[in-house]
A protein has these predicted regions:
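N-terminal cationic and glycine-rich segments that engage phosphates or anionic surfaces
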Residues: 1-103, 108-442
């Protein structure tokens, strides 16, 4: 009853209701674009392309585009070129002083960074669109192309580039006038769109003898446990207490209260998995071009093999430490605390505070990196346990982390709208308590 009442409260708030309707409308436009094929391609002959993109790297690309990749759609390249550009610009902000300065300039700097990201996205699209067209020609018969030659190539590159830019614009509109982060929501919708189809396929496989009903129930229970573990990973924090000095200005008293710095167990997010998979793509690509590849190369090109997943897990652990080190700055945190009259009880301000924060991050990053590596290779483990590759994608990796992260973020935004207007929220927070000052939010 409480949940039903909360849903009613959502639609009572005019601003929240308008934002939800706007978000759903944008999502509908995005989903409809999937069914608009590139001019010059016969949609009735796309069956072979769909079969080639049902699993593996192509399957991931198709899932992140919501199935548009296998439909030769105007949105076939999806939002991933923009994500790639965002990652590159973010890394530039770590390496080059000019971009570091932009990051510290507030709103004006953010606008410039966004503009550079858009320019880089167009550059990536100009390179990626012809590659996609080459793949189309390789997978489809010649009769699938009503138009061919230079005109088809140039027009398709322009349309694919415009399609991704339009999807970017839709995401920004959701962020500005809707609910949640628009780009993240578009990726999530693309993933969820494949879930019903892949689940029905898995049910069919099980019901036709491979494990039966019992096997299907075990799969669902295990998936539920994995989702709970991923929520703990995404939400897990170590809260560091910070005491602020008491100040009296006129007749008012400021400070004197204890607050907390929430240090996330998985501060690196999904980035280590993306970096590791990008590196592990090289053996797959090389093995694809080499006709007589060595046993070493063949072993590392098998996405579901032992060696591939072992190296992937090691890379994820290393990248988790690397990315956490460049995104979490204990020196800056200690300086900010000192400027605002704050200190950690029992720890001297300055260098001791930096060392204390650094030691905490090292301790919580270790289990976080191992759990992230486990989540990343779970789809391969699921495939080895006879789960179909299509459905196994939902057992972990970037797929599950994105789903859990975006859903929780969107629910928290809706929750904040409800609480601002004195309504009960959607979620009840719980805490797994550890030592003093250390909790894991659920």
């Amino acid at each position: 009853m409480r949940f039903i009442q909360t849903i009613k409260n959502i639609f009572k708030i005019e601003d929240l209701r308008a934002r939800l309707i706007y978000t759903l409308s944008i999502i509908l436009i995005y989903r409809l674009g999937k069914y608009v094929s590139l001019p010059g391609v016969d949609p009735s002959q796309l069956g072979q392309l769909k079969s080639q993109t049902s699993s593996g790297i192509m399957g991931l690309l198709d899932m992140f585009s919501g199935g548009a990749f296998s439909q030769a759609s105007i949105f076939a390249l999806g939002i991933m070129p923009y994500i790639s550009a965002s990652i590159v610009v973010q890394l530039l902000g770590i390496v080059f002083p000019y971009f570091q300065k932009l990051q510290k300039e507030g709103e004006s700097g953010r606008r410039k960074m966004n503009q550079y990201t858009r320019y880089l996205t167009v550059g990536i699209l100009i390179l990626q669109a012809p590659t996609y067209l080459v793949n189309l020609h390789a997978q489809l018969p010649a009769t699938a192309f009503v138009i061919s030659g230079t005109f088809f190539t140039i027009s398709s590159v322009i349309i694919l580039t415009a399609g991704t830019i339009f999807v970017m614009w839709l995401g920004e509109k959701i962020t500005d006038k809707g609910i949640g982060n628009g780009i993240s929501l578009i990726i999530m919708i693309g993933i969820i769109a494949r879930l019903p189809q892949n689940f029905v396929f898995e049910v069919g496989v099980r019901m036709n003898g491979a494990g039966g009903l019992i096997g299907l129930i075990v799969e669902i229970v295990f998936l539920f446990v994995v989702i709970l573990g991923t929520i703990l990973l995404v939400q897990g924090t170590r809260r560091v207490p910070v005491q602020y000095a008491r100040r009296i200005v006129g007749n008012k008293q400021y400070g004197g209260v204890r607050q907390y710095i929430p240090l996330k167990v998985n501060a690196a997010g999904v980035m280590p998995i993306i970096f590791a998979q990008a590196i592990m793509m090289l053996p797959v690509i090389i093995a694809g071009y080499a006709q007589n590849g060595s046993g070493f190369m063949v072993a590392f090109s098998n996405m579901y093999g032992f060696w591939y997943n072992l190296v992937t897990a090691i890379l994820i652990i290393l990248f988790t430490y690397f990315y956490t080190a460049i995104t979490i700055n204990p020196v800056q945190m200690a300086e900010d605390m000192k400027k605002n009259g704050g200190f950690i009880p029992g720890i001297k301000p300055g260098r001791k505070t930096v060392e204390f924060l650094d030691s905490i991050m090292s301790r919580i990053t270790l289990p976080g990196s191992f759990f992230l590596a486990i989540v990343a290779i779970l789809p391969s483990v699921a495939v080895q346990a006879t789960v179909s590759p299509q459905f196994a994608q939902f057992y972990g990796g970037t797929t599950l982390l994105i789903l859990v992260g975006v859903i929780l973020d969107t629910l928290q935004q809706i929750e904040s709208h409800l609480l601002m207007r004195h309504y009960d929220g959607l979620m009840k927070s719980g805490r797994v308590k550890g030592r003093s000052g250390a909790t894991t939010s659920i």
